[in-house]
Every structure is written in structure tokens, then in C-alpha cells.
Regions:
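Alpha-helical transmembrane segments and their cytosolic interface
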Residues: 1-31, 162-191
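Alpha-helical transmembrane segments in multi-pass membrane proteins
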Residues: 26-37, 58, 62, 73-81, ...
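Helix-loop junctions at the membrane-solvent interface of multi-pass transporters
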Residues: 36, 40, 64, 90-91, ...
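Alpha-helical membrane segments and adjacent membrane-interface helices in multi-pass membrane proteins
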Residues: 40-114
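Structural signal for the C-terminal ends of transmembrane alpha-helices
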Residues: 64-68, 115-123, 185-189
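Membrane-embedded alpha-helical hairpins and interfacial helices in multi-pass inner-membrane proteins
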Residues: 123-191
């Protein structure tokens, strides 16, 4: 499979952007975008983990930026939140968020952004079906680490009921939205 450009690469080539400055700008703006989307939260009374716009932003940044920039953006986002900035869901921040029940989901963001970026670099963000598959795989990376970590807090008998099933409807909406946005963006850029 041939490597293709990501949306971020498309603009870098068009603007002849200085590599390090362009990357730094993308990483910082991407981490702020994720922080803003994380504040879109729907707390669930029966779960320790809210439904947020965070995962949508993580997967979108990964696909738009590519594997390396996407993962670097997530690392920056996690570092900003770990330092105490209110960047995580519902304005939380600090190491307690990374070490608490949601910590595994947060750590899974790195793999999710890298994976969706890697797939986008191979053209998986060009049509609705392949974008949907890429987003499902990215979500799987988040859930694998998130559920494994959450099981330390709630026990393996409750982990799916508290950390997976309630979030499937929200994940479907976010995946559908991304599957519409990315191919449309590419059609617009090809003009």
C-alpha cells in the first residue's frame, strides 16, 4: 500500500511551512481542540466514565495529522492535563485523572491517534467505509486500554457494563460524524 498525504501534509506542502514550527503549531492547536471537545461531557449516573467529545477529537486529530503528529499531539495533551490544566473531561486535570478510573482511556488515546493516523496515511480517510473502519479500530485501542485499567477499580465482572456498553451509542454517533467529515474534507481539498 502506498503512503498518501494526510490533511496536515496537504497544507504543509501548499504553504511551504517550516517543518518544526508547523508541527509545533499543529500539536498545540490539536491539544487545545481535544481539550475543548473534552468539555462536551454527558455524565452517566451508573458509570465512573462520562461520554465526551474527547474521543471524537482524538480520532479526528489522528486522521488529520497522521501517525507521528497525531500521537505527539496526544502526548502533549496528556502532559498538559497531567500538569494540572483543566483539559480532561469535565474540567479535570492533574495526575489523579491519569491514575484514576479514566486513566486507561486517556493512555489509549496515544495508540488510537497513532493507529488512525497510520491508516489515514494509507488512504483510509478517503471514503466513508474505510474511514468508519479506521475509527472503529481507533476506538478499539481506547477501549482495550481503558477497560483493562478500569477493571482495577470496578472488577472484571462489571467492567463491560460500566466502561463499554453505555458508550457504544455515543461511539456510533462520533464514528458516523468522522466518517462524513474526513471524506468530505478530501473532496473539498481536491478542488
Amino acid at each position: 500500500m502506498t503512503l498518501q498525504t494526510t490533511v496536515a501534509d496537504h497544507f504543509a506542502l501548499r504553504w511551504r511551512a517550516s517543518s518544526w514550527l508547523y508541527d509545533l503549531t499543529l500539536i498545540l492547536s490539536g491539544s487545545l481542540f481535544i481539550a475543548l471537545c473534552a468539555q462536551i461531557a454527558v455524565p452517566l449516573p451508573f458509570s465512573l466514565v462520562p461520554i465526551t467529545g474527547q474521543t471524537f477529537a482524538v480520532l479526528l486529530v489522528g486522521a488529520l495529522y497522521g501517525s507521528r503528529r497525531g500521537a505527539a499531539t496526544i502526548v502533549a495533551y496528556l502532559a498538559e492535563g497531567a500538569c494540572g490544566l483543566p483539559f480532561f473531561a469535565e474540567g479535570s486535570g492533574g495526575m489523579i485523572a491519569l491514575l484514576g478510573p479514566t486513566g486507561g482511556y486517556l493512555m489509549g488515546f496515544v495508540a488510537a491517534a497513532y493507529l488512525t493516523g497510520w491508516l489515514a496515511e494509507r488512504g483510509w480517510d478517503r471514503n466513508v467505509l474505510s474511514t468508519t473502519v479506521a475509527m472503529v479500530l481507533g476506538n478499539a485501542a481506547i477501549y482495550i486500554t481503558g477497560l483493562a485499567w478500569l477493571s482495577r477499580f470496578v472488577g472484571t465482572d462489571q467492567v463491560l457494563a460500566l466502561g463499554f456498553y453505555p458508550f457504544v451509542p455515543g461511539a456510533i454517533v462520533k464514528i458516523t460524524l468522522a466518517a462524513m467529515i474526513l471524506p468530505t474534507a478530501w473532496k473539498f481539498l481536491k478542488r
